[in-house]
Amino acid sequence: RDARIRRLTIRDEKGVWLEANNLRLTWRYVELFRRRFDADLIEAQSVRLIRRPTLAPKGKDRGLPLSLHIDRARTRLILEPGFSYERGVYDVAFDLDVERRGGRRTKLAAKSVLHPGDHLDLDLAMGGNGPLRVVADAEEASGGAIAGALGLSPDRPFRLDVRANGTLS
């Protein structure tokens, strides 16, 4: 099935903190009966993170109500200063697998539109049957929104290179 959404917003008590425009979703809704959200493709013309959401007090963790499987997703991601202290615009592509009671895996690539060469690449796998794998590479030559989103100074050069593997106990 294909679904299209012209405008999607997510809000909390302070108002809208995420806005997505012109979403297209190709998914298998029958999988919901198996407690799985399964999408072949999710794409949006743009997704704006306007500010950080407020987090309500957390109750007892009951786990995820369903597994998430996204074969391919892509968008133009806009990080506003209210979210990352400096505006950033990125072309983002990723895939995602999150099991209700188990492993998580994603590969993500974000390339800056405003500052060519600035990027974030992530390959993450944890839990489930396989070993832990974390490979992260990011660079903002003059600082930027990725550093700001991580709580670091957005106006200083930022470099991240992480390689980890092993097991979780």
PLM region spans:
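Flexible beta-edge/linker motif
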Residues: 1-82
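Short, surface-exposed polybasic-and-hydrophobic patches located at secondary-structure transitions
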Residues: 57-63, 85-110
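Small-residue helix/turn framework positions
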Residues: 2, 7-9, 41-48, 71-76, ...
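Amphipathic hydrophobic-ligand
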Residues: 13-27, 67, 83-97, 113-123, ...
